[in-house]
């Protein structure tokens, strides 16, 4: 429920003065999620829409497609961020795999993703941890993940400055990820940042219900490392629901957890924890997709834009009450 937000004395103004506003390309247009399909055509739809000032892209297997995408994104003046998630999940790769050969393969794939990110002019690369091996092997998996991230941060430095960010997922509902609860994300970030000060975290609004955590309690834990944010929706109360789990349905889907009011509240939590006042402008991206029968990509995009506009307005209003 929106309430009065701390530390304000003036009207905030446009969202664009505080953050890049992005969309996750391979979720908005699921046909490109495996690194193939109508990548150029769907990216063009985002490039033509001046609501978005950033785009999160993923795997593009064809170098010619990447070259065309870079040209398009430069022309559109879009900030670009690269997600390794499509390449990693489709191949079932894990940066914390206990098997050395499997972990080497995962690290190799992410290095290829970093190369792609440079080709596309990306400002940051987003990582995903692997499956949680269970409580007994969790400490070992955490050490392996720290080592993998360190290797990848060093690799990213070889060609230039590109930020490396890890996204926080659920532990036991859908992705069953090592990272995981926000307390574990904090421990990881503290360890990695000892040698990699640019390393950061990404918090997704749709994952708080899946983690059974509240943004107002979890975000302060990681505020020093929180660089990016996602807004999305999830269904978790009914296992029979076709959108159950971490499937990124549209905002306001029946049975879902997130709608405009929750997004507005999240913006307030981020504001109170300094997210919008970083030295380098952050990015908030909508991660939603057409999921239920008959849903159209263009309508789901419009849904997300309306929610962002209204949520920011509600957030502004809460600061003037």
Please place each PLM-identified region on the residue numbering:
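Short, electropositive alpha-helical surface patch
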Residues: 70-81, 135-149, 177-191, 216-225, ...
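N-terminal pre-domain/capping segments
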Residues: 1-112, 118, 196-198, 302-321
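Acidic-and-aromatic substrate-binding clefts and catalytic sites of carbohydrate-active enzymes
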Residues: 29-36, 54-69, 133-136, 172-178, ...
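Acidic/histidine-rich catalytic cores of soluble enzymes
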Residues: 55, 156-253, 315, 319
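Active-site clefts of carbohydrate-active enzymes
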Residues: 238-252, 278-297
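A short, acidic, amphipathic alpha-helical segment used as a generic capping/interface helix at domain edges
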Residues: 10, 255-277
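Hydrophobic faces of well-ordered beta-strands that scaffold small-molecule active sites
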Residues: 19-27, 53-57, 78-85, 125-127, ...
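Active-site acidic/histidine proton-transfer and metal-coordination neighborhood
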Residues: 3-12, 96-200, 303-304, 318-319
């Amino acid at each position: 429920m929106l309430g009065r937000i701390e530390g304000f004395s003036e009207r905030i103004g446009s969202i664009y003065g505080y953050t890049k506003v992005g969309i996750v390309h391979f979720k908005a247009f699921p046909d490109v999620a495996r690194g193939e399909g109508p990548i150029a055509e769907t990216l063009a739809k985002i490039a033509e829409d001046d609501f978005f000032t950033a785009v999160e892209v993923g795997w593009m297997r064809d170098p010619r497609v990447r070259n065309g995408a870079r040209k398009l994104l430069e022309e559109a003046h879009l900030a670009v961020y690269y997600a390794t998630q499509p390449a990693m999940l489709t191949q079932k790769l894990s940066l914390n795999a206990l098997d050395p050969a499997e972990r080497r393969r995962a690290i190799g794939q992410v290095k290829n993703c970093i190369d792609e990110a440079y080709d596309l002019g990306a400002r940051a690369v987003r990582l995903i941890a692997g499956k949680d091996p269970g409580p007994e092997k969790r400490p070992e998996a955490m050490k392996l993940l720290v080592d993998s991230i360190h290797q990848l941060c060093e690799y990213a430095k070889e060609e230039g400055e590109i930020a490396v960010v890890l996204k926080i997922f659920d532990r036991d509902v859908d992705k069953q990820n090592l990272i995981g609860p926000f307390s574990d994300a904090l421990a990881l970030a503290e360890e990695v940042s000892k040698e990699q000060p640019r390393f950061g975290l990404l918090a997704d609004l749709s994952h708080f219900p899946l983690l059974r955590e509240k943004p107002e309690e979890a975000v302060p834990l990681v505020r020093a490392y929180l660089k990016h944010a996602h807004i999305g929706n999830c269904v978790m109360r009914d296992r029979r629901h076709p959108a159950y789990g971490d499937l990124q349905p549209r905002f306001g889907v029946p049975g879902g957890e997130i709608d405009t009011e929750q997004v507005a509240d999240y913006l307030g939590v981020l504001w109170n924890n300094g997210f919008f006042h970083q030295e380098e402008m952050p990015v908030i991206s909508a991660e939603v997709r057409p999921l239920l029968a008959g849903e159209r990509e263009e309508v789901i995009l419009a849904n997300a834009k309306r929610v962002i506009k209204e949520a920011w307005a509600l957030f502004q209003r809460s600061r003037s009450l």
